[in-house]
Amino acid sequence: MRKKTSSNKKKQTKKTNNISLRRKLRLIYKKAILGLKIALIIFVCLFVFTKYFAGIKTYLTTNIYQTTTKLGFKLENVIIEGQQNVDEPTILKVLNANKGSPIFALKLDEIRNNLKKNKWIKEVYVSRRLPNTVYIKLFEREPIAIWQINNQLFLVDEEGYEISKNIQPFPHLLHVVGEGANIYAGKLVLELQKYPALMNKTSAAIRLGDRRWDLNLKGNISIKLPEKEFEEALKYVDALNKANKLFNQNYKALDLRDKNKYYIEKY
């Protein structure tokens, strides 16, 4: 009986030792895997974010580009959409790549950021259409007025952004003059567009005290608009024009600043 008990104890001890050994091996294995992961992360960080292995990176990158180019992944076409005032050579110059260049070598974010430096471009999207095409979608700023300030002329958009000094292609745009005129031109033009006949006879809009507008109409007629709610005043002037009671009355100025009482001055 004692011999059996002694034998059982030995078996249990051996089993316990085996379990302990397996646990140690698993622990060593886990630590080894963790160490390899940490080493791999460090290597990748050094490879990507530092100048270490710069020669290897260049060699590998060059070989990847050469291999993919042979497989047909090279620049053959550039599709441009939304282009109106930005000329094509300007866009292609920003690509900084020739036909046949590795398409994966193109830095799309850099191309996008450089294109956005052009004042005409409000937003732009650049993408690859594999295997051989780059697609560029432009959203250009739309000029709505010519702003005169400090004896200089600028094309401005509805947000008042200065687009260009080249106003020659846009002689039809309304001239707005004065401090802050560029900022508020968008709302004024939007209202005037409701009355095309009046819009066509408006030669300039003067911003006064950064508070209100004076309109200069053809025929040397000045329209003094109120500081607030000038929409009703424009509606009144348009009604006069449609009734043929504006340009043949020898008017010099219409003072519409007080909505309760309008004043008319004749020559």
Curated annotation (Swiss-Prot):
Coiled coil: none annotated. Keywords: Cell cycle, Cell division, Cell inner membrane, Cell membrane, Membrane, Transmembrane, Transmembrane helix. GO terms for biological process: cell septum assembly; FtsZ-dependent cytokinesis. GO terms for cellular component: cell division site; plasma membrane. It is a single-pass type II membrane protein. InterPro entries: Cell_div_FtsQ/DivIB_C, FtsQ, POTRA, POTRA_FtsQ_type. Residues 1-32 are cytoplasmic. Residues 54-267 are periplasmic. It is found in: Cell inner membrane. The chain crosses the membrane at residues 33-53. Pfam families: FtsQ_DivIB_C, POTRA_1. Belongs to the FtsQ/DivIB family. FtsQ subfamily. PANTHER family: CELL DIVISION PROTEIN FTSQ. HAMAP family: FtsQ_subfam. This is Cell division protein FtsQ. It comes from Rickettsia felis (strain ATCC VR-1525 / URRWXCal2) (Rickettsia azadi). The gene is ftsQ.
